[in-house]
A protein has these predicted regions:
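N-terminal hydrophobic or amphipathic helices/low-complexity stretches enriched
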Residues: 20-65, 213-215
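Metal-dependent amide/peptide-bond hydrolase catalytic core
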Residues: 23-40, 56, 239-419
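C-terminal segment of classical bacterial N-terminal signal peptides
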Residues: 13-21
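Bacterial N-terminal signal peptides that target proteins for export
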Residues: 1-8, 18
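Acidic/histidine-rich catalytic neighborhood of metal-dependent amide-processing enzymes
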Residues: 133, 138-216, 256, 275
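Acidic-glycine-rich active-site phosphate/pyrophosphate-binding loop
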Residues: 115-130, 196, 211-222, 350
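Catalytic-core environment of secreted peptidases
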Residues: 99-142
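A non-catalytic alpha/beta surface segment that caps or lines the substrate-entry region
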Residues: 53-106
């Protein structure tokens, strides 16, 4: 049974004697909803939603291109401090952390949203309003997640909520593109190594729950040769021709529809002049799957295709070894999944149902990939509202009933912070 008592002006929540009961006991999420402190925090979320939206806009209008998240991170640091989080700090990677102690250090829940966007430096990040719709690069992905982090802390403060376990709120770096989850790797390999029991990332919009983790491998492939004049040195093996052969082979890959497995040559470059045989050409390749074996299979096909392309281009001109190739791994996100009956997954769906809503289950590539690969119960949830055109300059966020995502994230956090 839950019971609520007051101490030093703070409402203390004592609910469930074990995590198992929180996840298995009939009506356990409903029991939390009967708790006066929890009800107060949920009400505060709805009341505070205009402020949450203003925070979302404020964060979004601070540029945070890949590897340059510091300015936005500083804004989160100040906000964490203003909300009274403890030990607010920036770690070696640039993650911003703020600690909210519970009655005991464990269980320790980490809630995270990422600072970075996919948009390059110089992008106009001003947010435009049209009724309930906000438009701006990154407004949903992941400025909504950052605003929800702040809203959870604010609502718990407003209602005087304390939980048995502790929480750390993290605004992290390096989730997008070639960031390669560097923020998560720093967080779990050093900053909070061995200290985290559960992890929830808030990334994207709506009420989806992702507990299947799309892994990816990303390479920058560089073909090199002697180069020379297009007429005078004709007959030299051409790095761009080798690149073209490789792209043609990759485009013919056959991959399974289930588990969904994909490949993409996203960027290419090279050469110095129309009348010069290039000395270098490069491409960037992305491969994804939620299944580790399927990802390994397409990865093996990729290596074979590139090596064969170089051999064929050298053979074409009868000059073996003239061209060389390097394949630099620039991104490695582990694939995996949690079963639907995993405690953290059941809790997320139970909390959603207790609030009277439904949630879809899907796969995603988010910050949750990395802690999940370490065996830490992890998942990703949407931050509410409705997002469209993610990763596009016209990215939009419909604020209609967006408070629902914050309420769900708040109730999930409280449930997971129970003993």
């Amino acid at each position: 049974m839950s019971r609520v008592t007051a101490a030093a002006g703070t409402v203390l929540i004592f609910a469930w004697t074990s995590v198992a009961r929180a996840q298995d006991g009939p009506g356990s999420a409903a029991e939390l909803l009967r708790n006066a402190a929890v009800k107060g925090a949920l009400a505060a979320v709805k009341t505070n939603e205009p402020q949450t939206i203003e925070d979302q806009i404020r964060f979004c209008e601070i540029p945070a291109p890949p590897f340059k998240e510091a300015a936005r991170g500083e804004a989160l640091k100040r906000t964490f401090q203003e909300l009274g989080l403890q030990n607010v700090r920036v770690d070696k990677a640039g993650n911003v952390l703020g600690y909210r102690p519970g009655l005991a250090p464990r269980p320790h829940l980490v809630l995270a949203a990422h600072l970075d966007t996919v948009f390059p430096e110089g992008t106009d990040v001003r947010v435009r309003r049209a009724g309930a719709v906000l438009r701006g690069p990154g407004i949903g992905d992941d400025c909504r997640g950052l605003a929800v982090l702040v809203a959870i802390v604010r609502a718990m403060n407003d209602a005087g909520v304390s939980t048995p376990g502790s929480m750390t709120f993290v605004a992290d770096v390096g989730e997008e593109g070639l960031g390669d989850l560097r923020g998560m790797k720093q967080l779990f390999n050093e900053t909070l190594k061995g200290q985290v029991d559960k992890f929830v990332s808030i990334d994207g919009t709506g009420l989806g729950i992702s507990h299947n983790f799309v892994g990816s491998l990303r390479y920058r492939v560089t073909f090199k040769g002697p180069g020379g004049h297009s007429f005078g040195a004709f007959g030299l093996a051409n790095p761009i021709d080798a690149l073209g052969r490789a792209v043609a082979k990759i485009s013919d890959f056959q991959v399974p529809a289930q588990p969904k497995t994909t490949f993409n040559v996203g960027r290419i470059g090279g050469g110095t002049s129309v009348n010069a045989i290039p000395f270098e050409a490069w491409m960037e390749v992305d491969m994804r799957s939620e299944d580790r074996a399927a990802l390994a299979s397409v990865d093996a096909s990729f290596h074979k295709a590139v090596d064969s392309a170089v051999a064929e281009e050298n053979a074409r001109w009868g000059k073996p070894g003239m061209l060389t190739v390097t394949k630099d791994l620039v991104g490695d996100r582990p694939a995996g999944s949690l079963p639907a009956d995993a405690p953290i997954v059941r809790t997320a769906f139970e909390v959603t149902r207790a609030l009277g809503w439904t949630a879809s289950s899907g796969a995603g590539s988010t910050d949750a990939n990395y802690p999940a690969s370490l065996g830490i119960p992890s998942l990703n949830v949407g931050g509410g509202g409705r997002g469209t055109e993610a990763h596009a300059l016209g990215e939009a966020f419909d604020t209609t009933d967006s408070w629902m995502g914050t309420q769900r994230a708040l109730l999930l956090a409280i449930a997971l912070a129970e003993r």
